[in-house]
Each structure stands twice: as C-alpha cells, then as structure tokens.
C-alpha cells in the first residue's frame, strides 16, 4: 500500500510546472516531498504520546539533526484512552462510538436512560433527568469541542440531569469527526461520545419514540509522556527565524498534518543552507489535539524570545489537502479551498502578492481579525511578525484522512511560495 501511495505521489509531482519542479542543486524537491509524505503517513495513528507520534517525532528530529540542527526535547504530559468497548445500543440497533476526551468511562454495565434529542441551542425534546442526551449538531467541518455550539449544549444537558451525552458530528463524510479537547482535565460532568451521522438514524428514531439506550465506554486511560522538540541552528546572529508545525492528531492525519510536516522539512533543508544571516529555530509539537497543549508548553520553555525573533511561520492544518466532489466522493487534483492564511498586519500586502492564485490562500487575513490554533498562542506570547496557515479539509479529523487526501505536487507548490514569503520577510 505504501508503494502504491509513493507511486501516486510521484505521479502527482509530474504535474508540477517546470519551474516549480526544478531541483535546487541536484535534488528534486518534489520527490523529497513525496518521500516525506509516504513516511509520515506510514506511521499510522498520530495520537499524542502513542507509538506513531513518537516514531514520527524521532524521524523528524533525525532529519533536521542531519542538517546541523541541535535538538532539544521537551517532555509533555498528554491524556490517552485505549477503548475496550465503545458502543451505543438501543433495541436491535448498535453502533460504534468515539469516546470524547478527556474520557469519562461508564463502567462495564454502561449508562442507560431514555434517549432525548437536543439541538445546538440546548433545547431538549423532553426531560433530561436520567437521560442519554442525543445532540444533533448542524452540518459543519467540525474540529473542536471547545466551541460554543458543541460545549454549551453538552454542559446544559448535564446540568439538567443527563447521565451521558452522545453527539452526532454531522459533516461532509458522514463519519465521526473527532473533536479536540482540553488536555488538562475532563471538560464535562459525565461520559460524552461521538456518533457518525451515517449510524445515527435508528437512534434519532428511537428518541422520537422515547426508547431507552445504553452507552458503554470502557478501556484503559490516564496520562502518558509525549515530546515536543526544537532544532536550533545558532549562527551567532542577533535574530531568529522560527518555523513550527504540529505532528500529532486523532487518526493518520495525512491531509491534516502531512502537508505541514513536508513543508516544514522543505524549509529546514532550504534554510539550513540559504538563510545565513539568522539563527534558525524549527519547532515540532505534539499534543495539538488537546487544544494546542504542546505549543503552549513549547512557548514557555524552548522557543526563542519574542524580542529576538524576526519572523515566525506556523504551518498548521490543511496546508495543501485535496479537494473532493461531494456528490460522487471523487478526489480531485486541485487543493481544498478551506485553508486560511493569517498574517500580522504589516505582512498583508506582501502576502497578497505572493499568494495570488493559491486557492484559499489568495485572500490572506489580518491576524487582528482572524487567528486560530497555535498561531493564537504565538501572538499572545508577544511575537510581532507572524504568518500561519490553517484549515479544515473534507476529511479533517476523520479516520479515513489517508494518502488520497494529499499530493506531493500540491504540497511542493505551496511550500515553494512559503519559502518565497520567508525570503522576502527576512530580507526586509
């Protein structure tokens, strides 16, 4: 399967314009991107502190260490949960669910109560006392449980006496969309589970009839060590260039994280040779899915000081994921437009010029009006010159975010423009 993926990446690379595919020296950078994507995807699940995340971190650290960066590891404590049973049942209907972190287990007998439907405004179809609440979210590309349309109805249901809440994550794939969470403690007073829209029909019907359902969430959980790292190439200069990317996530994260990781490596390889008048700090964080837990810790301990940093580029989610046809489920050669470029105000004119024609990025936002994810943490820490890309592609936080969701050609063309942005900013 990996070999097939590699052939697909290489075939996609052939579609690059001649100028974009030219090698720097004897290297074909697009082919390097293909290999990097294949390697990243091959690590499997990237949940923070798990085997895939740890192996990925070790690989990335070794890649930039070979370029001359000195690596400093930073331990981060992250939650984990390995399910034994995770299911919702009602009569003859039974469906797998995704336990919402930080997981509150039910015990082996589960939690049983009448199914009561609630909507995004917290309105309930009946009494929630002793109920299993069924939250039917509106259609969206969901990403986090921290937003009000998710957090507030769940909290209200528990306040009204619900024993558990099951959330239908309505979105473009019909599958469970995993939701980021506070990584420090459980967000809610009881068990919360996510249900795929494709599996929700029997339970919505049962809620209309007032039937009882049982939610079972059992498994092994707690906290485990994960690790951020920073690679420094200290040239003894006055100022630093910082480039960061998260690597962790709920599933395989091919489209969500693969493009950012490959672009980060592209920039590290280029900057280690070409950027000679700045010190370099290349930062790679775990714990992203716990509301940027890793990034927050890195900013406290390892990142260069704001006053010493000329420019910080953050490569977040959906750097260059594939577009799809919703009607047919067919992947397209083009890039998903739901990616956003946010820059500090002084960088807006340059960003508009450089990213003209780059789908989704051609209309950059001022960070005064729009920021997200780790960028928000970076700005809050006092960094003055910052650019970040982030977004939500069709399979964002979905189990089948796999090799179909990213191509070397699109990642390479995007990485090249970010290289141009760095060149122009640090020359100014």
Positions of PLM-derived features:
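N-terminal secretory signal peptides and thylakoid transit peptides that target proteins
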Residues: 1-17
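Second-shell loop/turn segments in exported
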Residues: 26, 42-51, 140-148, 152-153, ...
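Noncatalytic luminal/extracellular "stalk/propeptide" segments of secretory-pathway proteins
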Residues: 26-30, 35-132, 139-141
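Catalytic-core environment of secreted peptidases
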Residues: 29-51, 61-68, 124-126, 132-147, ...
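Soluble metallo-hydrolase cores and metallopeptidase-like ectodomains found primarily
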Residues: 93, 97-125, 181-255, 266-273, ...
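Extracellular/luminal Protease-associated
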Residues: 98-191
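Metal-dependent peptidase/peptidase-like ectodomains
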Residues: 238, 285-387
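His/Asp/Glu-rich mid-to-C-terminal helical/loop segments that flank catalytic regions of hydrolases
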Residues: 280, 394-428
